[in-house]
């Protein structure tokens, strides 16, 4: 079901999806009130949902869906700062993917992005959204940030943790990062996410975690107690200068159809950290990160994968296991504990 107040978006999105023989569009409606009426007749397998709509906003509607009958939702949101904030709220409420749309040239953009849209809907149909319901864990930092949380951690470390994830990863990363203590090895993360969304995502996590979480900037140092998330639309590599790690943020072609790419990060970690690293590949569609994790393991790094049972989409971890890059597969709830155990000493 497509729910969007723009007649152009409804027409184009519904048409693109209907052209795929594996997808049936049961309805395309202008707002959530009309959607609710249609849902009484037939409940869809997947919703494609706008955020800003008349009579009921998309976030409120999403929460109603998840409370009544959890169903995969793909957000189709305008690429603005406000759109990024509301889309992050949607991911927190249980949406499984975001497709961004521009203010201008919308019809042509949707046609050009049809492959991404169709892939997102198909991946959403396979997602188990019941696993997306994560209880928000707040810390005192959400109300009053500790003034010394950065300064005490600015010594360097030879140990580094690299995390890679995609569909379902925003909720999975929240589970992992909020469970880590303040004294934690430096962390570098690739989460497949559009441009402008990663800063809002990092800011939200920073308010929930004992560690510092922020969107990476070029030449940021990787230090204990800090997690750096690759910016949407940019690749991120780990670099080493003597005893210090830092990140390089750069443009470049899509790798495995992604930018940032998990493979790019993992390969750089394998080359400059070797046995001092831990690689973790988590929920996500496709195979990005599978080759890079195998390179990390070959270089002496410890490697983990999120297990099938706890994944929203068991794609990236499955491919990493197939390619021999995974030492152990563990449940989502055990990953933080494994990070601390394997990086101790």
From Swiss-Prot:
One of its GO terms (molecular function) is phosphorelay response regulator activity. Phosphorylated by CheA. Phosphorylation of the N-terminal regulatory domain activates the methylesterase activity. It is found in: Cytoplasm. Gene3D superfamilies: 3.40.50.2300, Methylesterase CheB, C-terminal domain. The gene is cheB2. One of its GO terms (cellular component) is cytoplasm. The keyword S-adenosyl-L-methionine does not apply. PANTHER family: PROTEIN-GLUTAMATE METHYLESTERASE/PROTEIN-GLUTAMINE GLUTAMINASE, PROTEIN-GLUTAMATE METHYLESTERASE_PROTEIN-GLUTAMINE GLUTAMINASE. SUPFAM superfamilies: CheY-like (SSF52172), Methylesterase CheB, C-terminal domain (SSF52738). Residues 1-116 form the Response regulatory domain. Its EC number is 3.1.1.61, 3.5.1.44. Involved in chemotaxis. Part of a chemotaxis signal transduction system that modulates chemotaxis in response to various stimuli. Catalyzes the demethylation of specific methylglutamate residues introduced into the chemoreceptors (methyl-accepting chemotaxis proteins or MCP) by CheR. Also mediates the irreversible deamidation of specific glutamine residues to glutamic acid. The active site is at residues 166, 192, 288. Residues 154-345 form the CheB-type methylesterase domain. InterPro entries: CheB-like (IPR008248), CheB_C (IPR035909), CheY-like_superfamily (IPR011006), Sig_transdc_resp-reg_Me-estase (IPR000673), Sig_transdc_resp-reg_receiver (IPR001789). This is Protein-glutamate methylesterase/protein-glutamine glutaminase 2. It comes from the Bacteria. The modification 4-aspartylphosphate is found at residue 50.
């Amino acid at each position: 079901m497509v729910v969007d107040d723009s007649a152009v978006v409804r027409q184009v999105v519904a048409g693109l999806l209907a052209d795929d023989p594996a997808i049936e569009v049961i309805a395309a409606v202008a707002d959530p009130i009309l959607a609710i009426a249609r849902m009484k007749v037939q409940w869809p397998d997947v919703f494609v949902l706008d955020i800003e709509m008349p009579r009921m906003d998309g976030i409120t509607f999403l929460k109603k869906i998840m409370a009544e009958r959890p169903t995969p939702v793909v957000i189709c949101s305008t690429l603005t700062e406000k759109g990024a904030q509301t889309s992050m709220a949607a991911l927190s409420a249980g949406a499984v993917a975001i497709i961004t749309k521009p203010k201008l040239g919308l019809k042509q953009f949707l046609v050009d992005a049809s492959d991404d849209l169709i892939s997102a809907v198909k991946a959403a149909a396979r997602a188990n959204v019941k696993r997306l319901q994560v209880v928000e864990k707040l810390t005192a930092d959400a109300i009053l940030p500790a003034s010394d949380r950065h300064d005490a951690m600015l010594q360097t470390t030879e140990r580094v943790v690299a995390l890679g994830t995609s569909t379902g990863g925003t909720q999975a990363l929240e589970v992992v990062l909020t469970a880590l203590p303040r004294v934690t090895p430096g962390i570098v993360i690739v989460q497949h996410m559009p441009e402008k969304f990663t800063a809002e995502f990092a800011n939200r996590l920073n308010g929930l975690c004992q560690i510092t979480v922020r969107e990476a900037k070029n030449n940021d140092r990787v230090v204990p107690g800090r997690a750096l998330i690759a910016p949407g639309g940019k690749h991120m590599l780990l670099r080493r200068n003597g005893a210090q790690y830092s990140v390089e943020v750069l443009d470049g072609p899509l790798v495995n159809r992604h930018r940032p790419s998990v493979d790019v990060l993992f390969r750089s970690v394998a080359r400059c950290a070797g046995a001092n690293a831990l690689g973790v590949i988590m929920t996500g569609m496709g195979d990005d990160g599978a080759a890079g994790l195998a390179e990390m393991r070959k270089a002496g790094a410890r490697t983990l994968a999120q297990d099938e049972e706890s994944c929203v989409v068991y794609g990236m971890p499955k491919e990493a296991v197939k390619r021999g890059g995974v030492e152990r597969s563990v449940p989502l709830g055990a990953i933080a504990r494994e990070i601390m155990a394997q990086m101790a000493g």
